[in-house]
């Protein structure tokens, strides 16, 4: 819950400050590339494959995965909630530098992959 809010704020802040988009509907549409459960799932898989996360962070991600969903793609939802849980945990523990490291990688990943076309 909190991690989702932190991510939403980081994305909106990034888009307002660093994109050339000016219209609100364009900013909202662009934000969907970052805040969708699919982008979270693909990004967390990238982090796991590249050993970007510490062992403790992987454990937090795994414990934070929500197993109940009414959505069709439960794996996507579980990975997304695990990623949001990790961000929320880091926020509550005042690990803001680590949040920014992960978010910088997230921006790079979204901007360099086909997630922008989803």
Show where each model-derived region lies.
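Double-stranded RNA-binding/processing signature
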Residues: 1-118
């Amino acid at each position: 819950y909190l991690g989702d809010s932190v991510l939403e704020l980081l994305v909106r802040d990034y888009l307002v400050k660093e994109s050339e988009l000016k219209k609100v509907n364009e900013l909202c549409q662009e934000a969907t590339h970052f805040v969708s459960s699919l982008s979270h799932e693909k990004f967390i898989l990238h982090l796991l494959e590249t050993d970007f996360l510490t062992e403790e962070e992987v454990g937090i991600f795994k414990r934070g995965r929500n197993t109940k969903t009414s959505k069709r793609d439960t794996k996507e939802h579980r990975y997304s909630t695990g990623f949001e849980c990790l961000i929320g945990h880091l926020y509550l523990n005042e690990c803001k530098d680590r949040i920014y490291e992960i978010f910088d990688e997230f921006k790079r990943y979204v901007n360099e992959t086909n997630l922008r076309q989803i």
